[in-house]
Each structure stands twice: as C-alpha cells, then as structure tokens.
Amino acid sequence: TGTDGMAYTSTIFPIIIAAWLASKIEPWLKRWIPAVIHSMFAPLVEIFVVSSLVLVVFGPLVMILSGFITNGINSIIDYNYIVAGLVIGGLYQTLVIFGLHWAVIPVIAAQLSNGSESSRINAIVSVTMIAQGAGALAIWVKSKNPRIKQIAGPATISAMCGVTEPAMYGLNLKYGRAFITASIGGAVGGLVTGLLNVNMWGFTGAFIGFPSFINKHSGEIDASFTGFWIASLVTLVVGFLLTYLFGFKDSDLETERKVEKVRLGRREPVAN
C-alpha cells in the first residue's frame, strides 16, 4: 500500500493532528449517539475514525514533508558546507522535537555504508548534541535548586554521549530560552564544522564519537579530527555561556511548563 514502510510513529505531528481531530469529533458523537450507549460506542468510533485518518492521510503527508526536509538538507550541503553547518546546526534539534530527523538518518546511514564516503551531515549533527549538553551543563552550574541539579547532571553526561532527549525534554525545552541559546551554540558549532571542512566516518556523535572522525581510509588523525575538537569546544563554550547568561534563571522554575494528562477527546484533566 501507499503507507508501507512509512515510519512516522516517532514524530509528534500525527499525535497533534489526532488530538485536534478527536476534539472536533467527540462533540459531534455526543449529539448523534444516544446517551444510553454513548459511553460504549463513542470511544470506539472516535478511535477508529481518528486512527484511520492519521494512518492513511496525515501520516503519509508527514513523510512527504520529511522527504522535502531531507532534499533541502542535501541541497544546502551541496551548495555550501559553511552555510549548511550554520543552518543545520541551529535547526537540527528542532527536527528532533517533531520526529522529522528520522528522514535524515537513512541518508546518513547510506553515506556511511558506502565504503568511499564520509558524512558531512553527521559531522554537523554531532555538534548539535554537544550544544544541548552545554545548555544542560549551564543550568546545572547556575541553578541552586537541588531537584534541577539532579536532573541536569545526568542529562549533561547523556547529551555529551550523543543522547539529547533528557537534556531537551527534561530541561532546555521546559525553560524555553535554554533550548534557543543551546541551539545558537549548535549553529555556531555547525558553522565552524563547515569552515574547517570536517568529515565523519562513523555514526556515533558528540564527544563519545571522537573515533568516528579518524580517517578510516588512511587510519591517520587528519584535519577532520582536529576540526571536530575545535568545533565541539566552540559549541560547548558558546552554548554554555549563552545559556548561563541568557537562557536560564532559577525564577523560571516558578513558571515552568506543566503537561496535564487528558483522555482522548476530553477536555478535562484525568485525576491521577
């Protein structure tokens, strides 16, 4: 079928659309389904309609959007690696939020599976991981709140090892400005990556991925390895300083974003 192989389960776009559809369908079902059987049949009809529309219509549309993003990234890199580093470095982790980065990963895998190729895209992605870790590190240093420090310390280590979700969802996105300042650090790091023409021969990024920047053909430490460390350290410093100075303060804890659990098609929160 037209949806075979379309892995859009890791993007939040279908979830957002499903929630919106449910909010529109549920009042209509209340009017048309008799009250005596409403509690039994309304949820079934709602789930069937919403799931069908998401799987058949909106999911494939998300994959088409992902394809445009992939082609755009490749075009920018082919046009100018420096510009690509700036743009991708600043925006890649935003793609992660919406799950659209899964469109880029197969491109990276295809590049690395070809024995003669390296991946410039992945070299840029690597510094974006460090940038989010730098934001979490700044929060860990600046905050006086023990709970935040307990979150920020492990999140920093995780991001520096290539897993950014704890830093992003646990801290940087929750205190909005921190994500922006960290992303600016990623943009600067990506710019430096492009300026130094850094190539990458492996999949693992961030600091733990440093062996991936050793030229696998010659086995020697060349300009890409040196460029990786320069770009990574620049990213760390810029992301840390911007977040420390402008991205976070403990008073933000009073207005942190709260997420309430809701049932599909219902507006009122569910009691925990």
Model-derived segments and spans:
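Core mid-bundle transmembrane helix pairs that form the ion/substrate translocation pathway
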Residues: 26-99
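Hydrophobic core segments of alpha-helical transmembrane domains in multi-pass membrane transport
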Residues: 12-24, 46-56, 89-94, 131-138, ...
